[in-house]
Amino acid sequence: MYPFGSGMPSHPPTSTNHHEPPRAPFGAGWVPPMQQNSPYPPPSQPHPHSQPSSQMHPQQHQQYPGGAPAPYPPMSAPYPSAAPSYPPYPTSNPYPAQYAPPAHNHYQQPSVSNSPYPADRGYTPAMTAGYDAGYGYGNGQGHGQGHGHGQGHGHGHGQGHEYGHGYGQGYGHGQGHGNGQGHAHRSLPAHREGTPTVVPAANFDAVKDAHDLRKAMKGFGTDEDALINIICRRSNEQRQEIQRQFKTHFGKDLIEDIKSETSGNFEKLLVGLLRPIVDYYCAELNDAMAGLGTDEEVLIEILCTLSNMEINTIKNQYLRLYGAHLESELKSETSGNFKRLLTSLCTAARDESGRVDPVAAKNDARELLKAGELRVGTDESMFNMILCQRNYQQLKLIFQEYEGMTGHSLEKAIKKEFSGDVMEGLIAIYRCVTNKAEYFASRLHKAMAGIGTNDTQLIRVIITRSEIDMTDIKVAFERLYGKSLKSWIKGDTSGHYKHALYALVGEQRSS
C-alpha cells in the first residue's frame, strides 16, 4: 500500500516525541529527485528567491475582541504554552533542505530537450535511493526497524513505535511530558490509508513494453487494447522507464506518437499517465490558472489534500517548468479569504508528527468556536491557522471536541460562517481529515453527476489516486451513492476511454 495522506514531515518538530511513519509521496510510481541532480540551474544561472513575509500569517497568540462573554472558565495555563505543541508558521525558508532553491537573483528558463528525461529533472527511472525502509531525508535519519521503545515510558508512546521510522533526535523523553502537567502528549498509530488499484507490474521489461507499444502504433490503424494493457497497468515510475527505452530504441517520443495515434479523452488520459506525476500536478495547476478565469476547484482539490513534501516538490518543479513561483501565481489569481487560505496551504507548514494532545485539542475547539459562532462576523485567520497547521490526528480530536461542545459538526459551522471558495476549501480539509476516500469519491461523483461529464476532473482523480487508495475510494463511492464506480463510468464514458478507466480502477472489461 502506498498511502498519500498527511505525508512526510518536511522538518520534524523539535518538541515532538514521536513521528508518524512517513508515507511515500505521490504513491507507488514517484521517484524522489536525486539530490545531486537539482532541478535548479547552477549558481551561474541564478533565479529569483522569495522570502516569506512575516506579515503573511496570523500570530499564534492572537487575542479575540470583546463581545459575547466567554462561556468557558478561564484556562489555568495559556495556549499555546511556552513549549508549543505545534510548530509556528515558519520565519525562514519552508523548504526541506534537499528541495530548497538557492538564493539567486534571477531565474533562467531551462532549455527544452528532446529527451523526456533530462538529467536535471531528477525523475530518472534509474533513481533508486530515497524512500525505502527508513524513509531517510538524506541525513541518515531514517533508521528502518529497531526503534521501538516498547511499553512503560509513561509518555503515551505505547503504540505506534513498532514502525521504527524515527528521526533519532526526536525521541527525547526528557521534555517534561507526564511530569505533573496533568496531561501527556500521546502518539497514535499511523493511519494506514490506501489500497491502490495500479501497482508496479511484476516481471517488468521496459524494452519489451516499448517494442510492443511501437508495434501497436506502427502501420495502418492502432491497437488501442495493447496501449491500455501496457500504459494503464504499469506504475508511473515504470511508464517513465518505458518512455526512455522507446526513445532509445526508436528515436521517437512516445507521448508524441500517442498524440498522433489517439484522440479525445482517450488521448488525454494516456498522455496524463505518461507524464511524471509531479509534472502532471504542475500542469493541472497551471491549466487551472491559465487564461480567463480560474478553476478554483482544482486548486482546492490539489492543495488541500497533499502533504508538505508533496507541496514543496510541486512548488520547486512548477518554478522550473513555468518560470514562476506557484505562490505568486495563486495570489494573482485569487483574492480575499480564499487567497489567504491557499497561501497558508502553499507554505506547507503543517505539523506531521502524528502526536495528539487532548488538552490542546479542547483549547483549539474553543478558539474555533469563539472565532466563529460566538461572535459577530468570523475571524477566518484562526480557522486558517488551526486547519492548515495541525496534524490530521490532532484535527480529528479537535473536530470531536467541537462537536461535543456544540452538538454539531465543525463542517456545519463552516457552512454557516463562510461562503464561496474559502468555504469549499475549509470543507475539503475537514473531509480529507475525517475520510479522504469519501472526499475523492464525492469528487468522482460530481464529475459524472447531472448532464454531461467533467472528464478533466474524472481523469485527474483517477490518475492521481490509482496508485494510492482507489480501492478505498471505490468502496466509499458505492457506500455513498448506492451504485458501483464502474457502473457510473459505464454510463458516462464509452469506447477505449471507458476501457482504460476500467483498467485504472481495477475493474474487468465487461462491454
From Swiss-Prot:
InterPro entries: Annexin (IPR001464), Annexin_repeat (IPR018502), Annexin_repeat_CS (IPR018252), Annexin_sf (IPR037104). GO terms for cellular component: cytoplasm; nucleus; plasma membrane; vesicle membrane. It comes from Drosophila melanogaster. GO terms for molecular function: calcium ion binding; calcium-dependent phospholipid binding; phosphatidylserine binding. Keywords: Annexin, Calcium, Calcium/phospholipid-binding, Repeat. Annexin repeats lie at residues 204-275, 276-347, 359-431, 435-506. Residues 1-76, 93-123, 138-195 are annotated as: Disordered. A pair of annexin repeats may form one binding site for calcium and phospholipid. GO terms for biological process: response to calcium ion. Belongs to the annexin family. Residues 138-149, 165-181 have a biased composition (Gly residues). Residues 47-67 have a biased composition (Low complexity). Pfam families: Annexin. The keyword Nucleotide-binding does not apply. Residues 106-116 have a biased composition (Polar residues). This is Annexin B11. The keyword Repeat applies. It comes from the Eukaryota.
